[in-house]
Amino acid sequence: VALLLSNRPDAGALGRARALGVETLVVDRETFRDGDRVAGLLARRQIDFIALAGFLWLLPPELVHAYAGRILNIHPSLLPAYGGKGMYGDRVHRAVIEAGERESGITIHRVDEVYDNGDVVARYRLEVRPGETPESLAARIHELEYAHYPRTIEREIMKL
């Protein structure tokens, strides 16, 4: 990991990254909207691959094009179900439970110019248990994310 970029100055990952000697940057929405500027910032740091986690802003088209096929995102549902703008975190888990779904999981996908729309790289499933709450489902989904996202990122980077 060469750089951790966040839109939230209070993100816990920033402190963890700094403690490991990883450069960190916090960007505001106005700066981030300039996709050419962000792509240039990343190129100057020789960033070859982008992995998103908990980043809720739609990426500017210029950035998506500059890193076409080299941006991954993780989503806490089996896309295309429960994806799209505004569907994140507990909102997803609550919707899954309220719909009576019998399974949920995570989707790791390439990023394009539409929320949660890119080509699926991997899906991992789990059973929604009777009596499941959004909080208990979130905890189990996080376990899937921690187990599979780093390995999937590594596998995709090795293909470059």
Regions found by a protein language model. Name each.
Residues 1-160:
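One-carbon transfer enzymes
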